[in-house]
Amino acid sequence: MLEGVEHLLLLLLLTDVNSKELQSGNQTSVSHFILVGLHHPPQLGAPLFLAFLVIYLLTVSGNGLIILTVLVDIRLHRPMCLFLCHLSFLDMTISCAIVPKMLAGFLLGSRIISFGGCVIQLFSFHFLGCTECFLYTLMAYDRFLAICKPLHYATIMTHRVCNSLALGTWLGGTIHSLFQTSFVFRLPFCGPNRVDYIFCDIPAMLRLACADTAINELVTFADIGFLALTCFMLILTSYGYIVAAILRIPSADGRRNAFSTCAAHLTVVIVYYVPCTFIYLRPCSQEPLDGVVAVFYTVITPLLNSIIYTLCNKEMKAALQRLGGHKEVQPH
């Protein structure tokens, strides 16, 4: 499904670009871009390749293990674990969309990406990233229902409702990414083709456009800002009710267990929103720190999410022990 959407998007955008070329005739269209990537001394190419390769393999295997565990362990066939399965798939796919091209650059020096490849990369990243943003909000709502309305949870969050909400996050991500990608690549690219970034992203592409990008920058800020702020406020509201409900639990053990179920989700939300805010919710810049932050939220964050959810989630740790054939360690 994702591949079909990407191919349709690419066809529409390239058709639009070709029509503009025929109309303007005096502009030279860019056929490819060069991903500058991380600035580093040549002798660090091999060590960086090995470091990012290890991170990439750990990310794919860690998130893949979470998905496998949720699918095979019937005790995890619950809404929160289903949402976690979606999150792991998103993290794994984001890593697969960005990291292989970086690895090729470190090892082979191959940093060229076709115009169509750049379109697909930008679309994929914003599609997956926006879907993840909606999913975090949905997971907070699920925790709100489970802790604040436990007696009604099973009747509200049915299997059908759970699947419908999860599908809604994917549709929302598709709409957002189609809008952003088409808005960026309707601009003419007729000269510079060096993308001073680790992948084709909106701020970096706007700097290469042969036209005024003020409207694009404003629309990007408004669109991403509205979505991020709305989702973040909904998450904060949900956790405000959750904390109030937890504090009313009489036993210390009960409060501790309730907090532990929410700690992992809150941690990954913070890890997601801080770099997102830094990159998109400020004026377009070309600071070296941008590349470092981009590496963090495209390479490091997907790995951190899998680690956080396996270390902070008691149910997931127990399920992994069962999957590995180890006896569960019962607390004394």
Curated annotation (Swiss-Prot):
Q: Does the keyword Disulfide bond apply?
A: yes
Glycosylation (residues): 26
Gene Ontology cellular component list: plasma membrane
Cross-referenced PROSITE patterns, in alphabetical order? G_PROTEIN_RECEP_F1_2
Instruction: Give GO terms: molecular function aspect only.
Output: G protein-coupled receptor activity; olfactory receptor activity
Q: Which InterPro entries match?
A: GPCR_Rhodpsn (IPR000276), GPCR_Rhodpsn_7TM (IPR017452), Olfact_rcpt (IPR000725)
Where, in residue ranges, is this chain on the Extracellular side? 1-46, 97-120, 182-218, 280-290
Task: Using the record, list the residue span of the signal peptide; answer none if the entry has no such feature.
Answer: none
Q: How does it sit in the membrane?
A: Multi-pass membrane protein
Membrane-spanning ranges: 47-67, 76-96, 121-141, 161-181, 219-238, 259-279, 291-311
Q: Name one Pfam family in it.
A: 7tm_4
Q: Which residues lie on this side of the membrane: Cytoplasmic?
A: 68-75, 142-160, 239-258, 312-332
Write the record's keywords in alphabetical order, separated by commas: Cell membrane, Disulfide bond, G-protein coupled receptor, Glycoprotein, Membrane, Olfaction, Receptor, Sensory transduction, Transducer, Transmembrane, Transmembrane helix
Question: Gene3D superfamilies, per this entry?
Answer: Rhodopsin 7-helix transmembrane proteins (1.20.1070.10)
Cross-referenced CDD domains: 7tmA_OR10G6-like (cd15942)
Annotated compartments: Cell membrane
To which protein family does this belong? Belongs to the G-protein coupled receptor 1 family.
What does the record give as the function of this protein?
A: Odorant receptor.
**This protein is called what?**
Olfactory receptor 10G6
Q: Which organism is it from?
A: Homo sapiens (Human)
Q: Which gene encodes it?
A: OR10G6
